[in-house]
Swiss-Prot record:
Lineage: Eukaryota, Fungi, Dikarya, Ascomycota, Pezizomycotina
InterPro entries per record: Pec_lyase, Pectin_lyas_fold, Pectin_lyase_fold/virulence, PEL
Predominant location category: secreted
Biased composition regions of type Low complexity, renumbered to the chain: 354-366
The protein's name: Pectin lyase D
Length: 373
């Protein structure tokens, strides 16, 4: 009987391992990402084990089947911060990171801030990793993920990253890339984040695809003091190509996305709902092709006062794209001021194979994020 039970257990484990893997294939600029490939799946059970698997030099398929709570793993830090947006209960406060309060908000009242230290810096993710969640069980709480300094070939799929010092600006980012290549982030839910849900830093992030993710901006704290998160998607690289598609951006109020500094963004088939501020902020060096996107109850789709980049976008189908990318571009719905005719954007993307956009719809609201593979 014991022998039979052992065989049954071994068979169950083998079936579980065989069933685990990346679902689907990446699209867009990171279409050749393979992550950990066919490495034998590993199942971390502690936060230390998860950190070790993500940061080592082995190709790995890492499966999350529980919540990994980093909230209290490094204790708390108490220091002086500031209150740039007021001290009402729904307003974020700011940590004085790198003298930010001192240099950028010198007139803001100072205040004491106490935050969870672990959230400040994300977990290092090394090259050739697939990080996959089982069902809706794979959650990283209290700390984000960080892909920097030349790492490449990473897939993150079907997990949630949540609760990173949401009271405090500079409390931590959910997903950070800075000098990373071939990164596919798919069906990830991010919620209650202190700073950015996604940030691509000033070094080049050459080929990145951010697809089918749920950016949940609903929070008890925000820089706009209205329960809508302001810091969402910040694309700031020196030579970046980013595919952003199928994502659901809910209850945001700014930087959704902010694009600048030689970043090429193909942003299509996303759905913005209940944005109390602006969605797009396009600065100098931001090159954006926006098509097939749907906007519902968005106060300002494009921040026109600070616009310094290049944009091709329309609320009607455009055949101009045909001679550059081999097909017509697809109309946005309720795009407001998100209209641009820059053929510079199209010309610079003409050498790339761009995915085709579908008609704009609200389907990301039910299809994006963890648990919707």
């Amino acid at each position: 009987m014991k022998y039979a039970a052992a065989l049954t257990a071994i068979a169950a484990l083998a079936a579980r391992a065989a069933a685990v893997g990346v679902s689907g294939t990446p699209v867009g600029f990171a279409s050749s990402a393979t992550g950990g490939g066919d490495a034998t799946p590993v199942y971390p059970t502690t936060t230390d084990e998860l950190v070790s698997y993500l940061g080592d030099d082995e190709a790995r398929v890492i499966v999350l089947s529980k919540t990994f709570d980093f909230t209290d793993t490094e204790g708390t830090t108490t220091t002086t911060g500031c209150a740039p947006w007021g001290t009402a209960s729904g307003c974020q406060l700011a940590i004085n990171k790198d003298d930010w309060c001192t240099n950028y908000e010198p007139d803001a009242p100072t205040t004491t801030v106490t935050y969870n230290t672990a959230g400040e810096l994300g977990i290092t993710v090394n090259s050739n990793k697939s990080l996959i969640g089982e069902g809706t069980s794979g959650v990283i709480k209290g700390r984000g993920l960080r892909m920097v300094s030349g790492v490449s070939n990473i897939i993150i799929q079907n997990i949630a990253v949540t609760d990173i010092n949401p009271e405090y600006v500079w409390g931590g980012d959910a997903i950070t890339l800075d000098e990373a290549d071939l990164v596919w982030i798919d069906h990830v839910t991010t919620a209650r984040i202190g700073r950015q849900h996604y940030v691509l830093g000033t070094d080049a992030d050459s080929r990145v695809s951010i697809t089918n993710n749920y950016i949940n901006g609903e929070s008890d704290y925000s820089a706009t003091c209205d329960g809508h998160h302001y810091w969402n998607v910040y694309l700031d690289g020196s030579s970046d190509k980013v595919t952003f598609s199928g994502n659901y951006l809910y209850k945001t109020s700014g930087r959704a996305p902010k694009v600048q500094d030689n970043t090429y963004l193909h942003i299509y088939n996303n759905y913005w709902e209940n944005n109390s501020g602006h969605a797009f902020e396009i600065g100098s060096g931001g090159y954006v092709l926006a098509e097939g996107n749907y906007f519902s109850n968005v106060d300002t789709v494009l921040e026109t006062d600070t616009f310094e980049g290049a944009l091709f976008s329309s609320d009607s189908a455009s055949s101009t794209c045909e001679s550059y990318i081999g097909r017509s571009c697809v109309a946005n719905v309720n795009g407001g001021d998100l209209t641009g005719t820059s053929t510079t954007v199209l010309s610079n993307l003409s050498g790339d194979t761009l995915p085709s956009a579908d008609a704009a719809s609200t389907s990301p609201a039910s299809n994006a994020g963890q648990g919707n593979l």
